[in-house]
């Protein structure tokens, strides 16, 4: 697992095992906030060990940017912490998270110690503010990757933990393309120093404009291509011919997963465009 100090008392963690998924920690003198948990227990436990033994504070809050397994299944490794999330996150963990975990535990012994912990504090509109030491964390909706997405701004440092609303390759299979485009545009206007993506590396201030433009161009490109394909009888075959490079992205993103995710985006978007409203 990679670890980096982003600013004073703000830390970033990236999985070496699963899809470069990330998590964060903001620490104060008395307690810390964890922003997302990683996909596998060992890595999440390493984050807890770092907080308890290097920072010497307990974890009081865990913020889930959305309900997906690689961001929320590690809540159970922070006993006593209050979990904060979008109201829809709680519903989705009940509807999808619990059955998905039960199925995964049959296949992967490492997950047998995992238990879904539902959010204790939820919201669906506006903002929630947490004071951690000298820093304000502003939590607000960031939809599009999923219907329960939120982002966390470290106000004083202008660092945004964007969750999966911002990734090297936008992923909309469980989301909405128009909502994620809106979220990305809003992120681009925030005057940020850093974007901590839900997967991949930290985006620095001088890289933000280009990253925003690249993601919006990608989404516009697939929207145009899928709309054209949807008018043809062999739509699926046409989608299979659309390479990720044609959209301005690289297949090496996310440890080589990008091409697979791109194809899933195309098929999901076709389904969304053609299903009855």
Predicted regions and their residues:
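Divalent-metal (often Zn2+) His-rich catalytic cores of metallo-beta-lactamase-fold enzymes
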Residues: 85, 181-238
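Conserved beta-strand hairpin/beta-sheet module of binuclear metal-dependent hydrolase folds
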Residues: 2-49, 151-164
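Active-site neighborhood of phospho(di)ester-bond hydrolases with catalytic His/Asp-centered motifs
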Residues: 35-37, 60-68, 84-87, 141-143, ...
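Active-site environment of divalent metal-dependent phosphoester hydrolases
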Residues: 20, 40-42, 67-73, 90-93, ...
């Amino acid at each position: 697992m990679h670890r980096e100090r982003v600013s004073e008392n703000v830390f970033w963690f990236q999985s070496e095992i699963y899809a470069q998924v990330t998590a964060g920690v903001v620490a104060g003198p008395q307690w810390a906030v964890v922003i997302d948990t990683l996909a596998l227990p060992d890595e999440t436990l390493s984050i807890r060990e770092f907080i308890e033994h290097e920072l010497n504070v307990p974890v009081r809050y865990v913020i889930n940017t959305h309900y997906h397994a690689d961001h929320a299944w590690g809540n159970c490794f922070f006993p006593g912490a209050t979990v904060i999330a979008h109201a829809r996150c709680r519903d989705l963990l009940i509807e999808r998270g619990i059955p998905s975990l039960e199925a995964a535990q049959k296949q992967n012994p490492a997950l047998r110690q995992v238990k879904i912990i539902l959010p204790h504090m939820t919201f669906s509109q506006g903002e929630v503010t947490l004071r951690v030491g000298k820093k304000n964390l502003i939590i607000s909706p960031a939809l599009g990757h999923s219907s329960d997405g939120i982002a966390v701004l470290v106000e004083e440092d202008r660092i945004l933990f964007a969750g999966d609303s911002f990734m090297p390759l936008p992923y909309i299979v469980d989301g909405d393309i128009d909502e994620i485009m809106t979220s990305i545009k809003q992120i681009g206007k925030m005057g940020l120093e850093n974007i901590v993506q839900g997967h991949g590396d930290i985006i620095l201030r001088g890289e933000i404009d280009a990253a925003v433009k690249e993601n919006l161009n990608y989404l516009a490109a697939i929207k145009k291509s899928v709309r054209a394909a949807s008018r043809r009888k062999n739509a699926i075959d046409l989608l299979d011919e659309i390479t990720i490079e044609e959209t301005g992205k690289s297949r090496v993103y996310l440890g080589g997963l990008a091409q697979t995710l791109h194809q899933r985006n195309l098929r999901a978007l076709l389904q969304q465009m053609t299903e009855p409203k």
